[in-house]
Amino acid sequence: MKSYEIALIGNPNVGKSTIFNALTGENVYIGNWPGVTVEKKEGEFEYNGEKFKVVDLPGVYSLTANSIDEIIARDYIINEKPDLVVNIVDATALERNLYLTLQLMEMGANLLLALNKMDLAKSLGIEIDVDKLEKILGVKVVPLSAAKKMGIEDLKKAISIAVKDKKTAEIKYPNFEPYIKKITSILQKDEDLKKYNLRYLAIKLLENDKYVEEIVKNSKVWNELKPVLDSIINELSKKYGEAELGIVEERYKVIDKIVKEVMKKTSGKLTTTEMLDDVLTDEKIGTLLIIPFLWMLFKFTFDVSKPFSAMIEYFFGFLSEVVKSSISNKFIASLLADGIISGVGAVLVFFPILAFLFFAISFLEDSGYMARIPFITDRIMNKFGLPGKAVISMVMGFGCNVPAIMATRTIEDEKDRILTILINPLLSCSARLPIYALFAGALFSKYQGVVILSMYALGVVLALITAFLFRKLIFKTSPSYLIVELPPYHIPHLNVVLKNTWERVYDFLRKAGTIIVFGVILVWVLSVYGPSGYLGEEVFENPQLIANSWVAVIGKTLAPLFSPMGWDWRACSALVFGIIAKEVVVGSLAMLYGTGEENLSSVIAHAFSPVSAYAFMAFSLIYLPCIATLAVIKQEIGWKWALFAVTYEMILAYVVALVISVIGNLLF
């Protein structure tokens, strides 16, 4: 079977992931790009007896290689030379999207344009002459609406034709053609350079691109080219200030001409998006509205998920009893029932909460509102010393700190990036939610949503204060500002929301099936063994026995340090195991208190006071990041900063928990 490799590329929020999923279905492979931890998604599909491998490149606005994502996209297209590059273009923002298109054409890529969101463009009064656009660019243009699955078959057909009918389209830049021609006439004298598109090399040399400059410096023609290039750049610098700015200006002149020829906007009235943004992005009103929006999100999550959690809780309690009564070998029965089933069950009981939370977040994302939160809060972030782009990473931190830290790669300034990474673990990821849900349900049942929301708010407040102090004491420079795309509002597409929800829930389940199982088994082993050897599986029913275990030794060693908070050795031990993954804390508590998930809430209600429980939640929010987060911090900014993060978070967690305990006990 003949096979081809194609790449999908486009600006962020153009529907690239939706098109990738529509093309590949479930045939998706997720890994990392070589040398970095940026996620690499690959998939495949078959059409007319041919196989197509699809590579989903990171979302980028340009290929100027100022960020890791841009470098990955550029290097892949230049070095891997895919059979076809499918450029996803947002029909509602044609002018902005065509900038990347022109850069791809400059590279000499075999190009196909997928003009997405045509239905939305039509509703906004935007008309695009697809045939004329195709003629001007010299590449095939396929109109579609991926969210409604319209045009996907047309896209597959166009791909199957374009991979065979390879051609390089070229856009002329009138004011720069003489310079480009002069440079390429020298470059073509070196046969080794002909593996690259010479026009692309010439344009990038005019832009002072260091990557291309290094390629040409090692060529046979560099000595001849250097004085010619310097002369041209000096001439352009006098005219434009910088030669690079001249190229950018020329691209936008071409884009402006194209847009005027192919696009008409028939509606002159205010759009729904413009009317909503007058209110929702207002500096004062918009900021105030964020709080009730987030409160409703949490209210929805817990009210709807409660009966589903109760059913899972009952199932795992029943399963644990069945295993104990069915397996004669008490060691194996205890490992399965008290270890794996009890521990994992205590975590999975929060699966509905996470599912509905992710659903609500995906709903807000697809509606277009979530993108406004960074925009609305940008000025506030700058007052606390954070760069504008940090807001995007912070919002992602509410899902998982690992991808949130990776997202800081779009921050160009190194000090800004390090600062953003250091404060990100203070933002409450979804893995901490089971801890909050357990304690809030056990001791604050009437105010469960408010208590949990307060944990998220506490994390944000601490992150902002920490950022302000670090900016003053360590990173003594001004933060950069945010440039972010605000997509139009629209009614969320259920299939897109469900797809995003499932991907996030699946990540949680995958983690629950690996790290959590390992964690609870480790806790079980340390519980049934002690300094004197094997204690027996009865430890979970006999508090006297488990008090002699290794896990008790660990907890009792730490207990005096945490006695002001009112926590016993079991609580201290659970926090230690939470370093593996925060989800492990709940499973550890279930085993250490010798109960299944069905009775854990009542046990917690007796073991903790409201004040000590709230302090425990706060400590869980702030203290050491999980192993995965610590590993990615080390990879991104090194061991020095990773150890710094561990140290300051432990100190901060202890101080905050102590303050809550002291003040709480004085007041209540």
From Swiss-Prot:
Per the entry's comment, what about the domains? The G protein domain (about resides 1-184) binds GDP faster and with higher affinity than GTP and releases GTP much faster than GDP. Release of bound nucleotide causes a rearrangement of GTP-binding domain G5, which may transmit information about the nucleotide-bound state from the G-domain to the transmembrane region of FeoB and effect Fe(2+) transport.
Q: Which residues bind GTP 1?
A: 10-17
Role description? Probable transporter of a GTP-driven Fe(2+) uptake system, might be able to transport Fe(2+) into or out of the cell.
Per UniProt, where does GTP 5 bind?
145-147
Q: What is its main location?
A: membrane
| Annotated FeoB-type G domain residues | 3-165
Subcellular locations according to the entry: Cell membrane
UniProt xrefs under InterPro entries:
Fe2_transport_prot-B, Fe2_transport_prot_B_C, FeoB_Cyto, FeoB_GTPase, G_FEOB_dom, Gate_dom, GTP-bd, P-loop_NTPase
Per UniProt, the keywords (alphabetical) are: Cell membrane, GTP-binding, Ion transport, Iron, Iron transport, Magnesium, Membrane, Metal-binding, Nucleotide-binding, Transmembrane, Transmembrane helix, Transport
Report residues binding GTP 4.
116-119
A single cellular component GO annotation: plasma membrane
Show the GO MF annotations. Answer: ferrous iron transmembrane transporter activity; GTP binding; metal ion binding
Residues recorded as binding Mg(2+) 1, renumbered to this chain, are 21-22, 24
How this chain assembles, per its entry, is: The crystallized N-terminal domain is a homodimer.
Consequence the record notes for mutating residue 41 to A:
Slight decrease in GTP hydrolysis rate
- Protein family according to the UniProt entry: Belongs to the TRAFAC class TrmE-Era-EngA-EngB-Septin-like GTPase superfamily. FeoB GTPase (TC 9.A.8) family.
Task: Name the residues that bind GTP 2.
Answer: 35-39
Positions binding GTP 3 in this chain are: 56-59
Q: Which domain of life is it from?
A: Archaea
Q: In the record, what lineage is assigned to the organism producing the protein?
A: Archaea, Methanobacteriati, Methanobacteriota, Methanomada group, Methanococci
* Record: residues binding Mg(2+) 2: 21, 24-25
Q: Please report the name of this protein according to its UniProt entry.
A: Fe(2+) transporter FeoB
Residue stretches spanning the membrane: 344-364, 386-406, 418-438, 450-470, 515-535, 574-594, 613-633, 643-663
Per the record, membrane topology reads: Multi-pass membrane protein
